[in-house]
């Protein structure tokens, strides 16, 4: 099975942006989210990773805009950002996206997350935003600002609750073009049977091939953002490289 690539469209105040290490205020603008998403679709993407960063940081919402973008696409969409309760979850699923990503809520509200997983199954992925703190992998919430506890304890709980897919981001790598954290991905795959989607740090085709080498361990896909926008490689080049 070949690695699935998910080009990212991160949205702030109606514009497609990229952050550096997930920090508000570090945005670089790239224009219309609709144009960005359609460009990835035209380049051969099977998935688009669409993120409402205003909702993720708790400072607003681009939900109507993103619902419109999803309606204009024929490819599958993974929708993320600010999905924290029944109303926001149902609104997200009603856009027609193929699946949603839960982030902060999976850390802060385990009971609600467990109910959501039981009800919607593999339409839900859980985003695990991770930072190495004093030699220990810790999860992060609220737009990567708050500590969410030990990664391995969090994973064990989510596995028990029936999570089938994790989107794993090393926050120290995201938006930096410094290469993915292959060790972290491998360690996560070793302790869960769920699918793993890698996020953060991809800067070269070689990085994607390195992630591709973990497919047999359980890595299903990779989210690619800044490297594409910065022109490090094109999506068709990346798709060709990992399809081998």
UniProtKB/Swiss-Prot annotation:
Q: Does the keyword Isomerase apply?
A: yes
For the keyword Mitochondrion, the answer is: no
Q: State the reactions this protein catalyses.
A: 1-(5-phospho-beta-D-ribosyl)-5-[(5-phospho-beta-D-ribosylamino)methylideneamino]imidazole-4-carboxamide = 5-[(5-phospho-1-deoxy-D-ribulos-1-ylimino)methylamino]-1-(5-phospho-beta-D-ribosyl)imidazole-4-carboxamide
Tell me the Gene Ontology biological-process terms attached to this UniProt entry. Answer: L-histidine biosynthetic process; L-tryptophan biosynthetic process
**Which keywords has UniProt assigned to this entry?**
Amino-acid biosynthesis, Cytoplasm, Histidine biosynthesis, Isomerase
Which residues are named in the active-site annotation?
A: 10 (proton acceptor), 129 (proton donor)
Listed transmembrane segments? none
Give the GO molecular function terms.
1-(5-phosphoribosyl)-5-[(5-phosphoribosylamino)methylideneamino]imidazole-4-carboxamide isomerase activity; phosphoribosylanthranilate isomerase activity
Q: What is its EC number?
A: 5.3.1.16
Q: Which InterPro entries match?
A: Aldolase_TIM, His_biosynth, HisA/PriA_Actinobacteria, Isoase_HisA-like, Isoase_HisA-like_bact, RibuloseP-bd_barrel
Q: What is the name listed in the Swiss-Prot or TrEMBL entry for this protein? A: 1-(5-phosphoribosyl)-5-[(5-phosphoribosylamino)methylideneamino] imidazole-4-carboxamide isomerase
Which species does the entry assign this protein to?
Rhodococcus erythropolis (strain PR4 / NBRC 100887)
């Amino acid at each position: 099975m070949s690695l699935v690539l998910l080009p990212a469209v991160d949205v702030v105040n109606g514009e497609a942006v990229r952050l550096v290490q997930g920090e508000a205020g570090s945005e670089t603008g790239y224009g219309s989210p609709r144009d960005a998403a359609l460009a990835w679709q035209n380049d051969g993407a099977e998935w688009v990773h669409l993120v409402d960063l205003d909702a993720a940081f708790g400072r607003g919402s681009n939900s109507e805009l993103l619902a419109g973008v999803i309606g204009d696409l024929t490819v599958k969409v993974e929708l993320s950002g600010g999905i924290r309760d029944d109303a926001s979850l149902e609104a997200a699923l009603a856009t027609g996206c193929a699946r949603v990503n839960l982030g902060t809520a999976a850390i802060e509200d385990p009971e609600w997350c467990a109910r959501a997983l039981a009800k919607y199954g593999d339409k839900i992925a859980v985003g695990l935003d991770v930072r190495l703190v004093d030699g220990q992998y810790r999860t992060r919430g609220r737009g990567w600002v708050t500590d969410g506890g030990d990664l391995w304890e969090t994973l064990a709980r989510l596995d028990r609750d029936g999570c089938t897919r994790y989107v794993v981001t090393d926050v120290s790598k995201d938006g930096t073009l410094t290469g993915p954290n292959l060790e972290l991905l491998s360690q996560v795959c070793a302790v869960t049977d769920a699918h793993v989607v890698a996020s953060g740090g991809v800067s070269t085709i070689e990085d994607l091939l390195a992630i591709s080498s973990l497919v047999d361990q359980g890595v299903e896909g990779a989210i690619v953002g800044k490297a594409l926008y910065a022109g490090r490689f094109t999506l068709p080049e990346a798709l060709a490289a990992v399809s081998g």
